């Protein structure tokens, strides 16, 4: 009753005529860890494919029905939404689908109606943290998560998705999420997802090194039109953002992808690789790789020399290249001080600090501020 009343109160704060886009409400909490393990909840869980979410769905339906009944009252006509949607977070312990696979007919089945949406418009908001976002959604290593989705999608339509694709503890490292998004956005479209939230660098936007500004652009384009070719989007981005420097910048991007693929293979990385801190830790890079990147950056800077006669254009192009330059610079600062001269190291540190400050870069990781690093340079 309390939850229903809070939703009803919110609807009165935002009348339909003034806020027509207010069409859904989220019932849930951020991270669903350590769910209840009492005897009664365990009994319900065991009945429904070992899914603890089976204890939550009936509660959600009760809340939704109360709100729907409230909206039908004549005095609440101004606040009524047609087909109002109630979402719940399917993440961690609550991601397991409460449906078993019936080998005899090749279909997912529910033990009873308590875990079905029935007449209520409730949908899961999936947070697929155990999908490997460096691989295609159709890759064999993503089979378990894909089957979990398929089980849910048998009974729930118009769902939402919270997706990932970076090193959350290292905002300066390159992460190859392009194999995933190339196929995933089409998959989500074909399965009637209505909202996708990509949690890339959630604490930093617009000045992301490691081509994460491009990653955000590509995701936005594919989520709007999943039939687009990712190679075309990459080329379009490079040509517009870097003009004559597109070729060396694209080579830098390819080198990043090759490093990521090699590191995954040699380190046997899985979906949990997002926890790694490559640029801030030893053993992930060879100095030859960094040196090669710096050489390509020198080519990129040389390509835009022609724009020095147009100071504003040159400044913008150089800054875009500078932001990507932060990636190898961070590797040197953290790992290879002894491999460069004292003067070169000081030059790298000074430029790194200036580019970060000029672009208001605030974080080294999702929860780590950059202040301490900049003060140490």
Locations of regions flagged by a protein language model:
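Gly/Pro-rich turn-and-neighbor structural signature
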Residues: 1-153, 163
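Alpha-helical scaffolding segments of alpha/beta enzyme cores, especially the outer helices
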Residues: 5, 9, 58-69, 144-151, ...
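Hydrophobic transmembrane alpha-helix bundles
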Residues: 60-68, 125-145, 193-210, 236-245, ...
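A generic structural motif
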Residues: 79, 127, 162-165, 195-201, ...
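Alpha-helix N-cap and loop-to-helix initiation/capping positions
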Residues: 48-58, 140-144, 172-180, 285, ...
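Generic recognition of cysteine residues
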Residues: 3, 36-41, 166, 177, ...
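Structured mid-domain segments that build the active-site/substrate or prosthetic-cofactor binding neighborhood
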Residues: 8-9, 14-18, 140-261
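Catalytic domains of carbohydrate-active enzymes that cleave complex glycans
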Residues: 219-377
């Amino acid at each position: 009753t309390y939850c229903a009343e809070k939703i009803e109160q919110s609807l009165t704060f935002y009348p339909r005529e003034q806020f027509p886009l207010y069409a859904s409400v989220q019932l849930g909490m951020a991270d669903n860890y350590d769910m209840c393990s009492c005897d009664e909840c365990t009994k319900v869980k065991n009945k429904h494919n070992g899914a603890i979410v089976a204890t939550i769905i009936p509660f959600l339906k009760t809340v939704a029905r109360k709100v729907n009944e409230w909206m039908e009252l004549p005095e609440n006509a101004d606040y009524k939404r047609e087909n109002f949607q109630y979402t719940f977070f399917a993440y961690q312990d609550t991601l397991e689908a409460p449906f078993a696979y019936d080998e005899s007919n090749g279909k997912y089945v529910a033990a009873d109606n308590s875990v079905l949406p029935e007449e209520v418009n409730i949908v899961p908001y999936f947070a697929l943290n155990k999908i490997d976002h460096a691989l295609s959604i159709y890759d064999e290593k993503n089979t378990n998560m894909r089957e979990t989705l398929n089980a849910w999608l048998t009974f729930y339509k118009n769902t939402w998705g919270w997706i990932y694709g970076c090193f959350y503890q290292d905002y300066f490292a390159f992460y190859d999420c392009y194999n995933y998004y190339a196929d995933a956005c089409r998959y989500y479209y074909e399965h009637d997802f209505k909202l996708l939230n990509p949690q890339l660098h959630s604490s930093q936007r617009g000045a992301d090194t490691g081509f994460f500004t491009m990653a955000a652009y590509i995701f936005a384009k594919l989520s709007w039109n999943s039939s687009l070719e990712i190679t075309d989007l990459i080329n379009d981005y490079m040509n517009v953002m870097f003009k004559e420097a597109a070729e060396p910048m694209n080579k830098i991007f390819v080198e990043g992808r090759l490093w990521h693929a090699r590191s995954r293979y040699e380190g046997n990385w899985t979906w949990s690789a997002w926890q790694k801190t490559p640029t801030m830790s030893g053993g992930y890079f060879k100095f030859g790789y960094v040196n090669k990147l710096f050489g390509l950056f020198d080519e990129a800077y040389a390509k835009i020399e022609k724009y020095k006669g147009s100071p504003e254009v040159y400044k913008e192009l150089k800054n875009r290249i500078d932001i990507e330059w932060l990636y190898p610079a961070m590797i040197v600062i953290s790992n290879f001080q002894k491999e460069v001269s004292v003067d070169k190291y000081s030059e790298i540190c000074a430029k790194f600090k200036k580019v970060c400050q000029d672009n208001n870069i605030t974080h080294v990781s999702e929860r780590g501020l950059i202040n301490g690093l900049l003060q140490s340079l």
